[in-house]
Amino acid sequence: MQLDIFKNKKILVIVPHPDDEINLAGALIASANNIAESIHIAVMTNGDYYGMYSRRLMEVDGSIRKLGIVSENLIYLGYPEADFASADFEGGKNIISYRGLKHTYALKEKPEYHWLKTGEHALINYKNIKSDIEALISDIQPDIIV
């Protein structure tokens, strides 16, 4: 792997589910961590389909620390597992999660990104997902997005 492209760069890794940071990007994160300026990991959903969200989110924190990333660089976007494939991409129609939830959430000790930015949970819809990702990119100003 040609790692020079990561040298002194800010990297943002966005993954859909907890454990994808290690399964999909673990080798890249571990390799780039020694030469990148910073690496931030954003997790889109909570992995709460089976109701084990807090455990899954804490596992993400543990896995990134093993890769050499500080917990402060972990961002939970906090969207519950839902049927996003059948949702309205263009409109603002709200989605209800598989567990009946209508808004974002994360851990009490580490709230989701939207809450940290606004003091409110975000309704689950594509407008809010897009807005959160755009705001995250604007906040971090990454050179590389994975």
Predicted regions and their residues:
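Active-site rim/loop-helix segments in enzyme catalytic domains that contact anionic ligands
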Residues: 1-140
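Short N-terminal targeting/anchoring amphipathic segment
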Residues: 140-146
